[in-house]
């Protein structure tokens, strides 16, 4: 209805222009004595509760007064990024800035948020890059975040080497600083594996086992940044050919592709799927939810693992935002996040009385996340709920830069072709069994294998103005990716790719249906 669309449009404008109207469902509001800090976050209510309580207590002990936090939780990190960019663009259009030596300066209090707390390093890096604004007829880069400004000695004391696997723990200029670590691994139902007589998974390749047809739960990489990160880690660890093969076969085993990365852990715990991919704390939290009170974590029917040497470990950062209301208070919150007390909130058991030596851990909620500081593993690992060491598990393979291909290709060969893919996968395995019994089928199998794993070509215009059909391959990846930078060309490519994959899967099914070999 038109009147409904109009109302929604007004509400959207209000959301962009008046950030103080945004409130998390069930979130806390500024109340009580002391200053207030405004934090926009994708973090859960449990994390918000523990960090607000602990920070206020720390601030009162160190600065003489408690603090309240005004949490804003409008959605996931991708949604938050879009919201912030819109608000900062509006501020530039309204002239709420000064241009000093080519840098955009926004005075404290001009913008609505002090900090972005949580989300992966990719999104926080986008905050550091910001956007390009046209000012006085020129394009000027406007970072949304600002450097935290701690001394390098302080950073070295907190982090030591600025590295985990192939990733940074903090942005070198401190536009973002990691506060926790996120792994992207495998969640599985132990009971279902036992009933099937299968060993529980230890590597990503285990999710390609044909016995898992229709039993793997995955999120849609076009909707979930976390699952894209997991798929990217597989490509990085296994390389182009083997990596894409694993992703194709994993997609062929899916029960579904969901838009919500939180759904697979729930369904796996309920026995609706045997295994899937998840962020570590989604997996561990769900395992805890189905564990009997007082039972150890290993007693849960749900398990989670980070495949050693292949898992992508990413910093979960915090960023100070340009023009926020209280920059000094925001900086204190960042400093607090790096204390051992704050780090203990991520992985210690709940301690309602806050008894025992510091750090004392959370009061109510067990967050089941990995601390970012090495000292926690060196001195306090015996107090962890989960016996984890992400520094040992992290893959040390340099990023190959293929992430942008994942939503495009998996969307085409998996999500939008799921029925055809699954039918072809089952047919391919029947052919493999047939060829194993009768070598006369070997040539037919080879053709089916080639069709199943095939990739399309892309028309690319070279510097000479000539159009060439380039195979989507490691060699031609950069050229093909450049085509996708144009929105219209990218949309046409996605349609063509989907048609290509469906035709190839149909070919596999037809080859298997033959009554005679070549």
For each feature predicted by the language model, list its residue ranges.
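Long, charged, low-complexity terminal extensions
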Residues: 370-518
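Early extracytoplasmic/lumenal segment of secretory-pathway proteins
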Residues: 19-129, 265-266
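Ligand-binding pocket segment of bilobal, Venus flytrap-like solute-binding proteins
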Residues: 233-300, 304, 344-345
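Extracytoplasmic ligand-binding site segments that recognize negatively charged/polar headgroups
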Residues: 42-49, 72-74, 78-81, 112-260, ...
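A bilobed periplasmic-binding-protein/Venus flytrap-type ligand-binding module shared by bacterial periplasmic
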Residues: 187-192, 313-327, 345-346
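Small-molecule pocket liners
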Residues: 182-185, 232, 302, 314-318
